[in-house]
Amino acid sequence: MKTWLFVDGYNIIGAWPELTQLRDQSLEEARRKVIDYLSEYAAATGYETVLVFDGWRVKGNRGSSLENPYIEILFTPEGVTADMAIERLVAGLPKHQKIYVATSDRLEQETVLAQGGLRISAMELHNMVFTQKEAQRARIARQPQSANPLDAQLDEAVRRKLHAMIHEENE
């Protein structure tokens, strides 16, 4: 069973303190940062993640998507809010999927619950993302460090050939 995470991008940017502060300087940078955070989270959890940004007030906007290896990023067309897009996407999923929707919009939360999804507030998602980030840092810190990190990843036969080549050049 797949686990899905749908995220209202601007709602998250408006709720997370570090993103709100960044948004006040550059909305583009705040979007990039939320994409980075959610990409890392999706890579670590395996959740099918869809990040939706409102484009509903942009005249003539047809909507678009961005390429990302870990998450799907959608910009809604004119007249379609992120909430509306998320509702449609959730309604179109096959039954028996685990679905989380991250938004602090009360009406959206109720709609998601009615469709069988689970709601996550913006701050709950914040805690989940940063708890995962910290757990990953701790795992990396516990791993033994090699003087040559590439050397530790090489197959023994390849390592011997490389060492032989290095010694031939030095002679």
For every predicted segment, state its role.
Residues 3-7, 11-171:
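Nuclease catalytic cores that cleave nucleic-acid phosphodiester bonds
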